[in-house]
């Protein structure tokens, strides 16, 4: 559960956006970063840790197994990066079809987006 340095990498319910109002407030803040496959919407929160929500539209990933794969990749990347991310509410939203994308390309895109987040 924890790495040798002692960083907690669990993905608990406290690290997720659950309610529609939480998602709406992040979208209403209107700050976003765009990558090759994903958009990362963000909003500072008053907590000590980052929280994540994932949106994958059927229009961009028609098959359920592809949508689930994209969500799993996003959650796993967030879980591994959460301790170094600023205290923001984040929404990872797919904005380009992933039919030809590899898992490595999706991971790299997310890693670059998380790295570009303002550290406020």
UniProtKB/Swiss-Prot annotation:
Entry GO CC: ribonuclease P complex
Signal peptide: none
UniProt cross-references to InterPro entries, sorted A to Z: Ribosomal_Su5_D2-typ_SF, Ribsml_uS5_D2-typ_fold_subgr, RNase_P, RNase_P_CS
Transmembrane segments: none
Pfam families: Ribonuclease_P
Gene Ontology biological-process entries: tRNA 5'-leader removal
Reaction(s) this enzyme catalyzes, per UniProt: Endonucleolytic cleavage of RNA, removing 5'-extranucleotides from tRNA precursor
Keywords assigned: Endonuclease, Hydrolase, Nuclease, RNA-binding, tRNA processing
Top EC class, one word: hydrolase
GO molecular function terms listed in the Swiss-Prot or TrEMBL record: 3'-tRNA processing endoribonuclease activity; ribonuclease P activity; tRNA binding
EC assignment: 3.1.26.5
UniProt cross-references to PANTHER family, sorted A to Z: RIBONUCLEASE P PROTEIN COMPONENT (PTHR33992:SF1)
Family: Belongs to the RnpA family.
Subunit field text: Consists of a catalytic RNA component (M1 or rnpB) and a protein subunit.
Chain's role: RNaseP catalyzes the removal of the 5'-leader sequence from pre-tRNA to produce the mature 5'-terminus. It can also cleave other RNA substrates such as 4.5S RNA. The protein component plays an auxiliary but essential role in vivo by binding to the 5'-leader sequence and broadening the substrate specificity of the ribozyme.
UniProt xrefs under NCBIfam families: rnpA
Protein name, as recorded: Ribonuclease P protein component
Gene giving rise to this polypeptide: rnpA
